[in-house]
Structures are given as C-alpha cells and as structure tokens.
Amino acid sequence: VFTLDGADAKDLDDAISISRDGDGYILGVHIADVSHYVRPGSELDREAMRRGTSVYVTDRVVPMLPRPISNGICSLTAGVDRLTVSAIMHIDAQGRTVRSELHRSVIHSRLRGVYGELNDVIARGAESEYAEKYSVLGESLTCAQELYSILLDASGRRGALDMETDEARIILDENGAPRDIVLVERGTAERMIEQFMLAANEAVAQTLRTAGMPCVYRIHEDPSPEKMQAFSVFAHNLGLDITPLRGDRVTPAALSAVLAEAERRGIGSVVSVVLLRSLMKARY
C-alpha cells in the first residue's frame, strides 16, 4: 500500500495497492475513513457541512475539517496504521472489472510517493535519483504501470474523451507576492492515479446501483446540435477531418477521433478548450 500525491500535499486522503491475479490484477483504492471520527450531527459534522469543501488557494488551504483530523489522524501517513474504506477491484487483462468489494479496513502505507519523483523513475529507471526510494514497491510499481496502460486502452475503446487542459500555478516570493506563473505538467503518475480513482468511482456506483441504494450521479448529456455545428466549423477551419462528426448524433468516440488528430498536429490544447466549451455542463 502506498500514497501518491503532489510534493506539497499535507492531507494524504487516498492510497492504492495492486498485485497480479493470474492474467489480471487486484487493485485496491483506500480512502481515509473520516466518518469514524466525524459522527453525523456532531459539531464537526455541522461545521463541515457549513463549509462544504476545503478551499485551496495559491499558498494555503482553508480546510473543511480541523487540521489535526485532515492532516493528522485521517492523513494516510507512511509507517502508521490508518482507518480507511477500501474498494477492492478484480480487473481482467482487457481492463474490465469482473468483481469488486467494499470494506472498512486498516492500512499501513509503506511509502509516501510524490508525482514528480515517480515520473522521473518511470522515465529514467535505475538511473533516477529516486530509484532506491521506490524500489520498496517491488512488482507493485510494474503492475501499476501495466494496469494503467490496460485501463487507458479500455477507456479509448469505449470512446472516452481525454481532454488535456493546461493548469497554471502561481509562484510567490518570500513576501507572498506573485513572481511567476508556470504551467503544471501532468505525467504518467498523475494520469495513472486518475485512472485508478475512476475505476474505484465506477465500482462504488455499480455497488450502490445493484443494491438499489439512492446515489447522486454526475451526468453529461449529449451536446446540443447547434454547439456541435459550431465546433465542426471551427475544427474544419483548422484543417481537421470532421467526417466523424457528421451524423444525427455525435458520439464520444467521434469527438475522440478529432481530438486525436489535433494532438498529432500539435493543436490539441486549443481544440480541447473549444470542445470543452461546446459540451453540456455536468448535472447531478
């Protein structure tokens, strides 16, 4: 079991475990069990409900829960036991979740991983200055990379949209004044965790649906014909092949095909932004 977050993260609220299972894998996503410490109707619960979320600004965090909880007892610190809720997924070689289970659990993280460090290990292998640190993961790291690739391929076959948009980070000086704005780079490590969290979300949603329990779902409706027509004109003017966009209903696979061509031609970012604005807003 290990965590993987940004270098500045203080509240480590999720961890993963992974092992080989025949031709497939067993993926565990472990989320800090805040409900063990924050009881329904308590003062902490009411204050958390009032705040709604933790607010992340440039150089600080206004937490939803007191720091001794979010950064302390509920942070999945390496080397100590922590209470979690775990989604255990059995995933086959085609990226299909064939079985999943949800459990209250106790985990003991072996490593506090950092995105940038792991990206360096993935890129440079044994030559990375972080190779020794991540060697404790053994075959788990190999399995994680293999499963990430499998899930990504499965997502592509389903026609899932992978829209990369640039995220900016403001660099402050010692007085708290902005001195630079840089683009945040997303590497394999970030995308790998994203895929694993999506798999866990789908497993939880499927479990609740099967049990007939009420649940809030995030829904993206089909884009309007007018917005798709405008996007088609935009893409055509850039010289992109819009053949996949013709028809009565534009599918995610069709949009993915246009995005893929845009990426190959080095204009993926701008096309992703325009496409994002053409899609319907999510509703719950």
Residue ranges: model-predicted function:
Residues 1-284:
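Conserved, carboxylate-rich catalytic/transport cores that coordinate ions
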